[in-house]
Amino acid sequence: IVFDISDPMGESTCVACGECVQACPTNALIPASVAQNNGHLDVDKIVDSVCPYCGVGCQVELYVKDNKIAKVEGKDGPANHARLCVKGRFGMDYVSHNHRLTVPLIRIEGIKKTPEIDVDPDNPLKHFREATWEEALDFTAKRFRTIQASTGSNALAGFGSAKGSNEEAYLFQKLIRTGFKTNNVDHCTRLCHASSVAALLETIGSAAVTAPVINCLDSDVIVVIGANPTSNHPVAASFIKNAAENGAELIVIDPRRNGLENYAGHYLQFTPGSDVALLNALLNVIIEEELFDRQYVEAQTEGFQALSEHIKSFTPDNMSPLCGI
């Protein structure tokens, strides 16, 4: 394997996605999990699934042996077309990791909760004892009822998981609101994405993507701002890189280098926190120089005149000292 002609792997642009392993026709390259088994892979079944790591929705084939995932390969789905990133291909071993909880544990009586206690994940039974599900649920419910009775329902709160489905999120908030009788329910998405959901709904009518990311392969210009697909959505980033290599104009707007700027024709490294100033300056130029489809704007938008008046003072000259561009 040659990485960037002669660069060592760690210094090259290799992202360890394992595509070379999946494509290798001679089995000269095989996953470590297979190599540890003398290069032989005898599986009980192959299960079709979807990678849980990010929102791209890559379809995968899980090769299962003795109820453990022995190997993962990309499936030709609409989002990934058989591609996977390093997490999707090599990061599924957590499923059978020995640090995972397989039975309920209850803290041993007399062992206090203090930051000084260092729980050994290889031997949690120093601080906890195994319990049945019935005992654990009864124990938890009793503690919840005690807190409710002594300090009120608002002393309780629930925090949902981004790994759950929409249906699971709905059931979770219903449990907190109707069972715990409190509105103290939250979720990481509320902090990260709620503002963008509201803004996207108001501006374009949809709070989700309106086209598959693979469509970037048919785009002339791609603008990436406020996103780090290289780390957060690596398979999506691979299609963006392909598009740029095939002639698409890639514009990356970000105060932090994330690797995608290496493929960009323009990289705007603005001052952190000055996104709005930069975008208003771009709006100013687009409107003042009439670089927009007037017929479309008149037919499909509202409030354009007010926007035009609002951004008149946000000229590039005025915004440049703020955003550093």
Where in this protein do the model-derived segments appear?
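N-terminal export/assembly segments and adjacent metallocofactor-ligating motifs
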Residues: 1-289
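Short, flexible active-site loop motifs that bind/organize anionic cofactors or intermediates
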Residues: 4, 126, 297, 309, ...
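Residue-level signal for threonine
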Residues: 258, 293-294, 315
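Active-site phosphate/pyrophosphate-binding segments
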Residues: 282, 300-325
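Short helix-loop capping/hinge segments that flank enzyme active sites or metal/cofactor-binding pockets
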Residues: 290-304
